[in-house]
């Protein structure tokens, strides 16, 4: 699994030649792909890319602030370790050019909810009983997020936890700029 530092280090090397994205895509779980497929894989994982004369550029570093989509995310989990805990709620709003444009909210089915988590979040087992499967909620969240700039109060935790849970559920990790 790529760490936030690995992703950030890579994203700070842009612009890069198109073929330089192949090793990163392989490490992120896409396998060894041709450059065009590696670009599409990374775009699908949330990296906002544009291409000029064989060089890849991050749109998030060239877009004006008015053209940037900020996605403010908050998650709730039933524990702090994504290896043995899961996401139980995802909430997010998109903000662009001074306007909130979309929102996203999912409760996620779980058989485990410690009393202290219920007390902190206000979420009950009854709420989670009819929740979505975690994989489905995470896939829907990725589609909502697209290549938006991932923002959160506890960004390292939220981003890492969601990315790990995506991989655990057979999805590719998040690679969005944070």
Task: Please tell me what each predicted stretch does.
Residues 57-59, 68-176:
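Conserved non-catalytic scaffold segment of RNase H-like nuclease domains
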């Amino acid at each position: 699994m790529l760490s936030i530092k690995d992703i950030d280090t890579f994203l700070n090397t842009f612009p890069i030649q198109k073929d330089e994205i192949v090793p990163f895509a392989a490490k992120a779980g896409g396998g060894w792909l041709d450059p065009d497929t590696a670009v599409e894989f990374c775009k699908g994982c949330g990296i906002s890319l544009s291409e000029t004369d064989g060089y890849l550029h991050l749109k998030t570093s060239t877009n004006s602030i008015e053209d940037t989509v900020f996605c403010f995310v908050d998650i709730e989990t039933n524990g702090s370790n994504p290896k043995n805990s899961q996401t139980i709620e995802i909430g997010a709003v998109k903000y662009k050019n001074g306007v909130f444009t979309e929102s996203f909210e999912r409760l996620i089915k779980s058989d485990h909810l410690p009393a202290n988590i219920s007390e902190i979040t206000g979420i009950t087992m009854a709420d989670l009983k009819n929740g979505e499967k975690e994989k489905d909620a995470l896939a829907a969240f990725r589609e909502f997020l697209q290549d938006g700039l991932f923002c959160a109060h506890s960004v390292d935790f939220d981003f890492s936890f969601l990315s790990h849970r995506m991989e655990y559920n057979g999805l590719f990790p998040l690679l969005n700029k944070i």
